[in-house]
Amino acid sequence: MAGKKYREAATKIERFRDYELAEAIEKVKEVTTTKFDATVDVAVKLGVDPRHADQVVRGTVMLPHGTGKTVSVLVICKETKAEEAKEAGADFVGFEEYITKIQEGWTGVDVIIATPDVMGQLGKVAKILGPRGLMPNPKSGTVTMDVAKAVKEVKAGKIEFRVDKAGNIHAPVGKVSFDSEHLNTNIVAFLKEVVRLKPSAAKGQYVQGIALSSTMSPSVKVKMDKFIS
């Protein structure tokens, strides 16, 4: 059952109303009651059937104002790339010792970047990393020889997103403490990329719903007209 604060917050939102994005941002800020700096999330309902490979929507986007979160990064590479990764700001850098650590159950990072020449060995831990969304992937730019660029992008606010089985995409787009304009810019950048990635196999209306919420807050529906494609 929802807590008292959540129920009180929900009364401040018109349930059947779609808010303009700027209004929705202010509403989420108003109803967030957490003592910590809550993350703002966007949820997008898409008219796709992710059971079909040609309707899977996945991608990355650079949020202009970052996520507000300190992202911890592990780079798995051979010695020749290790210094480059460290200088770019990677929190952990290594090769076989980290594969062993992961096999033993360690997954204490937000993002893993790997060079192509270690992907064979990384396959040993794919079953551990895959379900946690940590397996490096060339499509998301986390399998690359340019480890410095990849580390800097992730640290600066590059996020990865993927449609789930129900046809929804969720993404963190900043913190409640962010300036409203900065949140707006981040959200628009994310939504534009989702729209750009519309699969040609998708039938009917592509964007079917957009909602904004923060950690432990009710969600606020957003008007879709500017983002329907």
UniProtKB/Swiss-Prot annotation:
GO cellular component: large ribosomal subunit
Gene3D superfamilies assigned: 3.30.190.20, 3.40.50.790
Pfam families in the record: Ribosomal_L1
GO molecular function: rRNA binding; structural constituent of ribosome; tRNA binding
Keyword Chloroplast: no
GO-annotated biological processes: regulation of translation; translation
Residues forming coiled coils: none
Domain of life: Bacteria
Entry keywords, A to Z: Repressor, Ribonucleoprotein, Ribosomal protein, RNA-binding, rRNA-binding, Translation regulation, tRNA-binding
Function comment: Binds directly to 23S rRNA. The L1 stalk is quite mobile in the ribosome, and is involved in E site tRNA release.
Quaternary organization: Part of the 50S ribosomal subunit.
Similarity section: Belongs to the universal ribosomal protein uL1 family.
Protein name: Large ribosomal subunit protein uL1
Species name: Chlorobium chlorochromatii (strain CaD3)
Gene responsible for this protein: rplA
